[in-house]
């Protein structure tokens, strides 16, 4: 146990200088001191049953002006987080009028307010099946745009592998355009997170500290939870360094990250580690060739370094690669203006294509009606 705590300390010690520097600048006003981070009330909540019966918590947000939505946006959150991590996207996209969007955010199994699942089902394959269940239940018709952060992005890739018909164009499936018109892959990876040629990631089954925590969580889960809760400033410094970039970070954001991380049991988190080690979904990226794709990542991301996003964009070909300078892994929390402006561009592209498609269909129907009434 002392070795484990020492290992955690070693990670956090590297953050000490950064934390002290932030502390010296702490006199400046916290821009999010009064922001209700993660506490925006949804318009509706519900539960979707996964294919194995696991209950998945779902929150819906309608357009703020009460107008009719043109697109359904589904947010797929990252490892150890919850739907609450989409706070700024949920807030800002609700105000959109061009296009109006209906937002759907859900918690992965064994995360947040969703049901706990068997460790054997803690796989990206199962998460993709869960996402498919959410789409069927919450967006049975109409265009969809998927937002995937970190493990959520991996889940979207696996969905493309399991159900390519959701993404493929009329030329491929013969039944009209796929339901998924756009995808945002945020701070994620398509290949195994510890693969050669890219920076070694902490989200790796090869990391000895991760394995140590996993073994201890299985042997004495209450002890691990206690150590995590009692970590205090040590844990806060580590989270500050690993989740965010090197710039001025709102203390409220760091507190919010800690709150998110503490919402999922260590035992549940550790059960997902092997699926990261097995993650290799570059072949699935070809399915996005006829989908609008935005690949967004901070170049100070320590968990899924920017090289991963570069490779994803290169493999897709037509994807837009967005480099957010100085931002870390939680780029959508740290730099919401940069991320949201790109998401709005993506949504507007998808809406324009949908408008053109409907116009073509309407024109065709009009010509047919004229032919029959001659």
Question: Model-found features: residue ranges?
Answer:
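Conserved alpha/beta-hydrolase catalytic His-Asp/Glu region
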Residues: 218-287
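An N-terminal hydrophobic leader/cap segment in hydrolases
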Residues: 3-47
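Conserved HGGG/HGGXW glycine-rich cap/lid loop of the alpha/beta-hydrolase fold
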Residues: 54-116, 154
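Short beta-strand/loop motif that positions the catalytic acidic residue
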Residues: 288-289, 295-297, 301
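Flexible "cap/lid" loop of the alpha/beta hydrolase fold
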Residues: 161, 168-224
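Active-site loop/oxyanion-hole signature of alpha/beta-hydrolase fold enzymes
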Residues: 102-167, 171-176, 341
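Catalytic active-site module of serine/aspartate enzymes centered on a nucleophile-bearing elbow/loop
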Residues: 314-374
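Acidic catalytic loop of the alpha/beta-hydrolase fold
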Residues: 276, 299-304
